[in-house]
């Protein structure tokens, strides 16, 4: 009997994006009733992240526009997620495919919060609709079980009382809290204690109280049944707007987080402050969300960073989860391949341990905006960005050094000729060579360069151009001399020499990947590598020079065989609804990809 073939590829790991944040906008984290994961969103994706080991994550990308909020059902078997168009998708958590159970359109505008009734049967969804700001419906059928009315502006937050008699509370931008009784749910009263937007309303897990938080810095406590005001936490609770609040599972304490860059822990009974967590001093340290799940107190900063608070010692967080929440534009490896480097279009550079996925951010003064090139060389990693500079950070110190070379125009890529001690940069209007932190040569060009690669054997430099040509230069005595031009059918987007220096591969906007032999710069075979259906963004070589990986705007990665050009492996939907921005091989069977979705993925690929 024939042995079953191993799968041609497998997704080993996802180094997940951080939550997408926006100044002045609270975000909602979703708690898992089984205590294993927590939920947040970024772009079209819902991220299901393991709470004990954040290196484990699952990503759901089925919404056709930005997702704002996702919440587990109390049973833990379903997740409801709401997007910017007002759609709610209810999907299964048990299967890896996350099968869709239902899709409803409760309001015609962005959904800002979702809450399930404790019996899993009803859902309240609120936001910024056209004719109404919220709706209550059955999770199975979508039939209405009441109406959310009585508030005149967008509703930011809603919660179901977790015990009978059922109640719903909503917090709105008209500064009021509305209370509804049912089912069917009818407007009962408004509370007008806040003087600014109400950003969060949450019932205690036992249903005895509910608390509200607003941009006036105040946090109020109300009776869960009668909805009478019980009192206020602090006077006021925070110096800045309060973005979110979270109850301790036993209902005895409350956690609040604020734009004043602090989180505070309160006793519910006496409404007194227990401890304060100072999260930093910069705008990026504003706290925009919090969650209390089991023993984990989690907060999210404006920078997207997730912090696990330490109740025993407020000054030392238990864990800080870093990464990216903007699209990743560059990807590189340290010389020993133990560290993966990623850089995003907001200038953040992250290092990831290639074995465990643990990560940290590079500190110091970097580019502060989009990074277009990255390359490691010994103890340093070099980056170039659209601040028109070349910079370096130290591998050991994990921090940018004071090495800066100002460039005349925007760099699009960099490559290092180690034996010559030269860094070659492809810029929009010129090619520049840098040696010992000085520009030693620049060559004006009539095309716009997109990428650059160097061949240490022949001292050839290959540059991709938007003039549909691949330009080859030779480096002689610190000067670049044109050697040959190779025609493509579209703008050349990326170029790379094979590790054994015998081949050059280039990809273009006309969906093609072309392999050249370096000897004569002629195509290495007569097969057309044209299976992408849109612009190819990036190409990368396996260390043994036998396989080429290409990533495209069409969301797929294709692995091509050099020895057997007719064979290839297609990884469809590698980053769903997101173009592949960069690829690199960790070893001969492992490819790392980054996408517009801010995720970094690790793939195991079988030999072809």
Swiss-Prot record:
Tissue specificity field: Expressed in pupal wing cells.
Protein name: Actin-interacting protein 1
Domain of life from the UniProt record: Eukaryota
Record keywords: Actin-binding, Cytoplasm, Cytoskeleton, Developmental protein, Repeat, WD repeat
Coiled-coil region: none
Reported phenotype of the disruption mutant: Pupals exhibit grossly abnormal epidermal hairs on wings, an abnormal accumulation of F-actin and microtubules, and disruption of the frizzled-based planar cell polarity system. RNAi-mediated knockdown results in F-actin accumulation and moderate border cell migration delays in stage 10 egg chambers. RNAi-mediated knockdown in border cells results in accumulation of F-actin dots, enriched with Arpc1 and GMF.
Gene that this polypeptide is encoded by: flr
Localization: Cytoplasm, Cytoskeleton
Function: Induces disassembly of actin filaments in conjunction with ADF/cofilin family proteins. Together with GMF, promotes Arp2/3-nucleated actin filament array disassembly. Essential for organismal and cell viability. Required for the development of normal wing cell planar polarity. In egg chambers and together with GMF, plays an important role in directional migration of border cell clusters.
């Amino acid at each position: 009997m024939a042995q079953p073939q191993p799968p041609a590829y497998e997704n080993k790991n996802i180094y997940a994006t951080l939550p997408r944040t926006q100044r002045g906008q609270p975000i909602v984290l979703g708690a898992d009733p089984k205590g294993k994961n927590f939920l947040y969103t970024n772009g079209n994706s819902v991220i299901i992240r393991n709470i004990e080991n954040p290196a484990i994550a699952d990503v759901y990308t089925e919404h056709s526009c930005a997702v704002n909020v996702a919440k587990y059902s109390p049973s833990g078997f379903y997740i409801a997620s709401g997007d910017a168009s007002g759609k709610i998708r209810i999907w299964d958590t048990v299967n890896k495919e996350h099968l869709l159970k239902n899709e409803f359109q409760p309001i015609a505008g962005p959904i800002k919060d979702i809450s399930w009734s404790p019996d899993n049967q009803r859902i309240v969804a609120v936001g910024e609709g056209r004719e109404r700001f919220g709706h209550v419906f059955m999770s199975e059928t979508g039939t209405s079980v009441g109406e959310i009315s009585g508030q005149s502006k967008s509703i930011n937050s809603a919660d179901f009382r977790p015990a009978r008699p059922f109640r719903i509370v909503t917090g709105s931008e008209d500064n009021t809290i509305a209370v509804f009784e049912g089912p069917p749910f009818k407007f009962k009263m408004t509370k007008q204690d806040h003087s600014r937007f109400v950003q969060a309303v949450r019932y205690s897990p036992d249903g005895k109280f509910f608390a509200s938080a607003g941009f006036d810095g105040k946090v109020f406590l109300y009776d869960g049944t009668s909805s009478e005001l019980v009192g206020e936490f602090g006077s006021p609770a925070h110096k800045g707007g309060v973005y979110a609040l979270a109850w301790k599972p036993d209902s005895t304490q409350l956690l609040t987080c604020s734009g004043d860059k602090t989180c505070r822990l309160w006793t519910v009974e006496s409404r007194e402050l227990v401890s304060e967590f100072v999260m930093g001093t910069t705008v990026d340290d504003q706290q925009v969300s919090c969650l209390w799940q089991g023993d984990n107190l989690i907060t999210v900063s404006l920078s997207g960073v997730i912090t696990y608070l330490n109740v025993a010692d407020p000054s030392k967080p238990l864990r800080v989860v870093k990464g990216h929440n903007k699209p990743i534009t560059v990807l590189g490896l340290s010389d020993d391949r133990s560290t993966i480097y990623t850089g995003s279009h907001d200038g953040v550079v992250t290092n990831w341990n290639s074995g465990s996925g643990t990560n940290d951010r590079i500190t110091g003064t970097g580019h502060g905006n989009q990074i277009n090139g990255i390359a490691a060389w010994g103890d340093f990693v070099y980056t170039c960005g659209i601040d028109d500079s070349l910079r370096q950070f130290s591998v050991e110190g994990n921090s940018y050094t004071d090495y800066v070379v100002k460039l005349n125009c925007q760099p699009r890529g960099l490559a290092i000729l180690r034996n010559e001690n030269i860094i070659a940069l492809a810029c929009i209007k010129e090619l520049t060579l840098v040696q010992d932190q000085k520009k030693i040569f620049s060559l004006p060009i009539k095309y716009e360069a997109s990428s650059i690669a160097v061949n240490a054997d022949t001292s050839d430099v290959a540059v991709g151009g938007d003039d549909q040509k691949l330009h080859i230069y030779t480096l002689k005595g610190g000067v670049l001399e044109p050697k040959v031009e190779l025609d493509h059918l579209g703008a050349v987007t990326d170029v790379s020499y094979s590790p054994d220096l015998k081949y050059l591969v280039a990809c273009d906007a006309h969906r093609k990947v072309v392999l050249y032999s370096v000897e004569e710069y002629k195509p290495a075979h007569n097969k057309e590598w044209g299976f992408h259906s849109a612009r190819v963004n990036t190409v990368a070589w396996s260390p043994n020079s036998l396989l080429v990986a290409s990533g495209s705007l069409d969301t797929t990665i294709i692995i091509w065989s050099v020895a057997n050009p007719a064979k290839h492996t297609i990884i469809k939907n590698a980053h769903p609804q997101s173009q592949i921005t960069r690829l690199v091989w960790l070893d001969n069977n492992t490819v790392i990809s980054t996408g517009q979705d801010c995720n970094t993925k690790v793939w195991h690929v079988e030999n072809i």
